């Protein structure tokens, strides 16, 4: 066939009637604009003039947008589509002619190239911000508009109309070119880049100038927005380097919490104004949210409608293609009367055209769907950020009475932050479904009715009737989940108790008892999990079975009720429609549940936002104060001297005025004055009454009184935390005549530092807790830490003052926490300091030091006003002004001299109390609490350092390995799936269930394929042979049997997967618990408690509830994809050729996504905890924050944490969209390839329909394969962590002797022989005891002493084989303990530890958890421990409740309970490991007395905390550095004046 532009007919070149009357010349004329544009733009694009001429340097590869940016892109895409149609029409029309006519499609091809070039050219101009180059585009659109208009006019003259496709295409071209021309004119009008004297200069957005902003979705062009192309760099880079917070940067300004907070707050305030005149109405949060975020939701809904409507293109195109193939197969194609031009109807009846349209429809549908998802997710994140800011702002204004009186608990606030805001965010995600789903369902039913008639309604009815069952199942799932959560909380509580008391449990051989208790709770939890698994299985079953049931009902009804045969086109289009219909009906139950939860969340949020607030704080700025003159007169005090050397011995009779300050008495001013004050905690009843007090400026005011008299309330009333019923709090104006000091010049007169009675710490470093936002001053910081005696404690911390403390950091004692809070108040450069009972948790040494160095020296020398609440009356001699409180009123106010003169009775009462305190002081001087605190901290640090050392060694090994690895190896490790861990998890569920799951899954999907294949054969048979009734019955029967089998297998597979997951969870937890409980004590010393507990909480929860559904979804989507590929390949083997490149593309997409997704999920998780903790710690320290006036700083911190969490979540969502767009486009390519291969190669219309149906299915499941794969990889991390603990070596519980060989009453005498004993904690550690030899007689009382770290406690552990005895032996009553089973050995000895441990339960359970003793024996033990009367007075007696840790008893009582516990065992050997270290002297005396009488005939080994406690011992062992250096009686040891024991005795005197 001859090739020429106008064809090889000479008449085609005839121009006798005019050039414009020749269609070939008109088509040639249309080439001119395209050639012009290519000629102009290609040199610019290749030379790169645009980018070199950039006037603005932008660090991102992004740009500003010219006016009409999005419209231009939309019009350009529309134009490209019309060009494709023009090319297709030209090729089809040309195929109908005898010779080739290039003019029919060549201009369209050039137009397609030119239009593509125009958008690339425009993109580069925007990148360079050089709009003058747009003039070329303007000329192009003008020329294209003119030439297309000429062509349209010619067609009109030729008699063509809209029924002709060519006419329609040309008309569309004219409209689109005209609109694009209008866009260019608008750019000229706005930017004035040409034809105007003053061009409009526009800079790129502010966000793009910020190097920290990496989230570029709002700034990229429309194509990049739709495909998330800008994410490529981040996702690819994740292979080389893990994604961190620096990589994702900051949020754009429009998405930051503060921006959205302002929008929501303004909308909410507007609602409050509307209801201000209606007391019974509350402002609507719903309307406020709609006003603030309604527009993006409407945009998302529009995208969703478009996507849903385009979704119906699939069934319609399948119907058309199968019908065309069927006509070709039957030879019924009508080819007569073909004209040279195509009509629109003929064009749309072409199978290839339908295939391309299906491809484009899928591309558009998925693009709109992902755009809808993204907009709702972004809006939901913005809403959450705004709500968090609103809640936080409200917390900072919350009335103190709301929290203190229980009207608003910390748990409720945490729920608002962690749960309610997320509920509203998720509701917003699902919101467009509420109005999109009904339209989708109605459209689907209408199309089904058009295809199958009334029989379609039967299938729709099946779906509608079964949908409520899904809602019922969802409700039951929620109930089961709540029940599971309750049991899980109980199990974790018990596990936590075990881990905290593991040392005691091992020493008493009670591990199995407590392990059994946890296992019982676990069985209840598993029972609840079984219910959860059952309903989950039913939900999965319904999802899979309902489409099958609907199809079965429809086709059987159609076969018998309709006289027409079922055609392939109808069958497979109907199947596709049923799949579309089922999705919204199932989703409906989820949306309804979230809607109900959202309504409840809004109610809770509204109640919180309308709760009481504290009053205005203008009092802090002096606005409410009286004139200075009216509160200026104040009775001064004479100076007094301070003895900084003496410890805290103060006597009122020797009181003298100090010489600290020299100020005129009559001119001493008042800092704070309260007049006629009545204050309440919100109940309406006055807690403080008739308060008239004055706080002198620059002096020390002490507030004293009995417990509960209102001292702390008075401080809080002054700070504005209480409700003022009557009276005023006045803060004096600034005295301008007052001398200015350098130290006070920068101070705010009304700034306050405050240390609360209950210490409150930030989750931050020690330094940050002390400086509290103030600039760091090294000299001042050192002075403060020295004054508060903090330096020795700081030195014990692993990272010094850079160690993180608080809830998420190192656990400190009460005294250490108290001193840090006082140091915070001292460090602040404020004029006024409030200290609320700062000595309560401190021993006498620290109290004296803090009083002398911190208060009297540091604060008073700095001329600061100090208000001190205290019970330590011995410090009253230092007070400049004293306020005595009683029953919420001021009893007396004045100097100590005033009170001594005017209220002798009160003064004498104070003297009596001081004498009593002095007596207690004598005892406390010996019981050095601080030493104990530091010892405890040192032990904790030792454990952590040991663990850190092990981790550092592991890291060093890994680093050495990494040095040897090249980049490809690192990338391989980052992308490798943890298949070994997966295998361990699957085998944990049992091989039988694993094989059953695999077999049932394969069988189920085989049956589903068989159902569809049977349908293809059935419909193809009818279309070819028009088979009669007998064959119809055969096909219906076969179809019914297969559908029934498919429904049954759906149930079996869902149950099998859930059951296997449940079994795996059960086995993994059981193995973990037993491994941990039987682990060596060294493991618990070197592994943080939180780390172990995390295995039982978060990791177990993932294994229990997250892995099974992920595994089910992954296997289902993978098998569906494989079935689809197999069926398409069977129907059209040519498809296999295209499968390789598509498979390679899919491999790389999932490979890159999994790595990036894992990093982003970890970032999302890691940034969420600090945010929740910040809310929690703010609510706990609200009074302190407000006193310091640091609300703004804390708000800023909250906004930073919110934005950090939001940016991580936003990037994770964008990564998911990136994946789904690519897998959806890949699925569309599969559909296009399968369609073309089916049309050109298949002769069976049924198989063509089947192949296309599966091709459409694959689009839905490709992204689920990758998403589930990524989720499973993250979740398998939990299994890996659990398995890492399962490899730990357990203690050797077996002995060479059988338990039956051990005498029943062993040890009976209590004789102990220690032969050359060498002990170490682990094989790779140095010995802690070296060659110890000793002999202890039966019934002897032995004392063991030595300095810290000498090996005393190690010897006590050696008796119980808690440490490694690698040489020597211990023989008790003739039996070597190394031969005994561990349980037997430990159950026959008794020990009392330093830390008294009680477990939650009853007193009976704590004394005798094995339930072996009678009540009489228990009462006897309590009587011996002098607890009988106290226990009898409790409700329940022996069955009285013991709270967790025994917190409802004092420390002394707890230690006495431990003594009773030891007596219950009736062991002949008792070991006391510093048992009196943490109790007062009185309790110690009781303990010593009881031991001497109750254990008079037993061997008692006492490890001494104080040497005085073993002075009555019959034998003393003295250790130094693990060596027994002295062993003799006390008199003999004291006779050696230079001996270690004598030295210890002298030191402790």
Swiss-Prot record:
Gene Ontology CC terms, in alphabetical order: inward rectifying potassium channel; membrane; mitochondrion; plasma membrane; potassium ion-transporting ATPase complex; sarcolemma; sarcomere
Region described as Disordered: 944-967
Membrane-side (Cytoplasmic) residue stretches: 52-72, 123-132, 189-301, 372-423, 477-531, 593-990, 1056-1127, 1267-1549
Subcellular location: Membrane
Impact when changing residue 1547 to I: In ATFB12; compromises adenine nucleotide-dependent induction of KATP current; mutant ABCC9 that is coexpressed with KCNJ11 pore generates an aberrant channel that retains ATP-induced inhibition of potassium current, but shows a blunted response to ADP
Binding site for ATP 1: 705-712
MF GO annotations: ABC-type transporter activity; ATP binding; ATP hydrolysis activity; ATPase-coupled inorganic anion transmembrane transporter activity; ATPase-coupled monoatomic cation transmembrane transporter activity; ATPase-coupled transmembrane transporter activity; potassium channel activator activity; potassium channel activity
Result of altering residue 1043 to Y: In HTOCD; rat ABCC9 construct containing this mutation shows gain of function
InterPro entries registered for this protein in UniProt: AAA+_ATPase, ABC1_TM_dom, ABC1_TM_sf, ABC_transporter-like_ATP-bd, ABC_transporter-like_CS, ABC_transporter_C-like, ABCC8/9, ABCC9
Biased composition (Acidic residues): 951-966
Pfam family membership, one: ABC_tran
Top-rank taxon: Eukaryota
This protein's record includes keyword Aminoacyl-tRNA synthetase: no
The UniProt record lists the keyword Plastid: no
Domain spans labelled ABC transporter: 672-912, 1312-1546
Domain ABC transmembrane type-1: from-to ranges: 297-597, 994-1274
Cited PANTHER family: ATP-BINDING CASSETTE SUB-FAMILY C (PTHR24223), ATP-BINDING CASSETTE SUB-FAMILY C MEMBER 9 (PTHR24223:SF173)
Subunit structure: Interacts with KCNJ11. Interacts with KCNJ8.
Name of the featured protein: ATP-binding cassette sub-family C member 9
Provenance organism: Homo sapiens (Human)
